[in-house]
Amino acid sequence: MAPPVSDDSLQPRDVCVVGVARTPIGDFLGSLSSLTATRLGSIAIQAALKRAHVDPALVEEVFFGNVLTANLGQAPARQAALGAGIPYSVICTTINKVCAAGMKSVMLASQSIQLGLNDIVVAGGMESMSNVPKYLPDARRGSRLGHDTVVDGMMKDGLWDVYNDFGMGVCGEICADQYRITREEQDAYAIQSFERGIAAQNTQLFAWEIVPVEVSTGRGRPSVVIDKDEGLGKFDAAKLKKLRPSFKEDGGSVTAGNASSISDGAAALVLVSGEKALELGLHVIAKIRGYADAAQAPELFTTTPALAIPKAIKRAGLDASQVDYYEINEAFSVVALANQKLLGLDPERLNAHGGAVSLGHPLGCSGARILVTLLGVLRAKKGKYGVASICNGGGGASALVLEFMSEKTIGYSAL
């Protein structure tokens, strides 16, 4: 066990991150597609608790994000928690704030600790976009004469702006037009995301984050262990530049290559109060210093991080000049580019290990995943303060400020 933090560095109600884990991110219908979102969630929670050296029996509450809940069964967060060995007596709540669900879960967990309601809480998010069903909306009334309409549950509940009746990618095009961000700039950013992600993978920086996942390959055949983000292995810069626009045929700039990919994955964080960290002698990786939400018109969600981030930094009692690294979820390359422009960010300090364009974007997972990755960036680059933000459908965004506390590896030395 790592040495305990000194009592002069923590206040009793400080929110401390003592364990983190994420699964590798699997491609759509790819390496993790045989596992449900709740199973992926269980794997991440179990690993985070093990790395934190926290007995599951000590957990008081679980907040876990999940967006595409159809066909998962009742209370997905509870399924994930019980599957990780957390007792029946623990309260579990599933959070759906679209793409920000995982981060909002961490924010709610933090509030419960700050208010003195809890001392040990697990938070995070999960998604298996590969397993989202398609709907027969008229079947309940009876399927009579004629053809039936099949509705894609993933599009309907995850990727569609219900207010304007168009796909999320159209919002990316609106953003690109408004801020005059070209196709070439978006492609260059996407290539950079892949290059940074591949570099982090090749230098084992993601090993600190990832819990390997064992996947069955069928009866009588040995299982395989997935320990790398699947999307990074399919990078082809030349092909990326030739892809056609996906959402705007004439003059469009958002493509499948410079947008995030449909993916599967889960991420979890173990949060404890400063008082409990001292009592149990836990290794504190980071403190949560502040957080905030923001919202504007639904079709403008792409730039809402630029509203949420300053609010979170102010609530943390910091100045933007003190922030070492940022993570802004790459729903589309244009999202990172627009918010970088609006906030005047140094490109070298934004998404330093790649992002959703290269790694993938499992909706309910991503808000938690970027927090785990931000901690990895701060650890690798010896930063102190980091800010993560993620936009969400409907016009919103969430942001959270972390203070990195230690350069020591959490959990086992293998990490």
Swiss-Prot record:
What EC number(s) has UniProt assigned to this enzyme?
2.3.1.9
Record-annotated residues binding K(+)?
Answer: 256, 357
Which Gene3D superfamilies does the entry mention?
Answer: 3.40.47.10
Q: What class of enzyme is it?
A: transferase
Residue sites binding CoA per the record: 239, 260
Which keywords fit this entry according to its UniProt record? Acyltransferase, Cytoplasm, Metal-binding, Peroxisome, Potassium, Transferase
Which tissues carry this protein? Expressed in the vascular system of roots, cotyledons, young leaves, fully expanded leaves, stems, flowers, and funiculi of siliques.
Q: Which reaction does it catalyse?
A: 2 acetyl-CoA = acetoacetyl-CoA + CoA
What GO molecular-function term can you cite, just one? metal ion binding
Give the highest taxon in the source lineage. Answer: Eukaryota
What are the GO cellular component annotations? peroxisome
- How does gene deletion manifest? No visible phenotype under normal growth and stress growth conditions.
Function, in words = Catalyzes the condensation of two molecules of acetyl-CoA to produce acetoacetyl-CoA.
Q: What is this protein called?
A: Acetyl-CoA acetyltransferase 1
* Taxonomic source organism: Arabidopsis thaliana
UniProt lineage: Eukaryota, Viridiplantae, Streptophyta, Embryophyta, Tracheophyta
